[in-house]
Amino acid sequence: LVGATGAVLARPGGTRRGFVHALAAITIGAAAMAGPLTLMWRGKQVPPIHDISTDTDNPPPFFAVLPLRAGAANPATHGGPDIAAQQKKAYPQVAPLLLAASPKEAAERARAVAYDMGWTVIAADRDEGRIEATATTPFFGFKDDVVIRVAPAPQGSRVDVRSVSRIGKSDLGTNARRIESFLEKLGGGS
């Protein structure tokens, strides 16, 4: 606002220095506001939830990461039917992945994809088909916990993934995007 006022008041017949400074102020101000405005816009596009699962009827529970979540603002337990309904409406594409691979093979591939995505793997049990990891967001460094469950299915394996933010009422869609990206990478090798 100050930059715009300066640009208007800059003397048309005088030096261009005042006008250039005013334009620089406008540009810097706009750039500074772009990030917060984008976050506000994104927050209005998604429901205020922070727990996303491919299986909303029986979300994979956390065990190994629970000590790391001590003091976290958000619980590790699923929010129940209301959260599941909001998720299904906003992210109908978040669903289990069926792989034509044995559960042990699928679990090993899932662990490799988790590492490739830069997650910190806390626990991985190929025989049990369970992986727990922590993903850290790039810019703010928020910690989100992920659990992967691999179970036998008629044609191979079923992979379910759950991602839960430790803080924040809304994840701004981060957990759904994380799950989709993970499943896309995992399914690419089937």
Question: Could you tell me what each predicted segment is?
Answer:
Residues G3-H21, G35-S190:
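Ser/Thr-rich, low-complexity intrinsically disordered terminal regions
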Residues A32:
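Contiguous mid-protein beta-loop-alpha structural module that forms a pocket-lining wall or clamp
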Residues H21-G29:
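Serine/threonine-enriched low-complexity regions in disordered or flexible coil/loop segments
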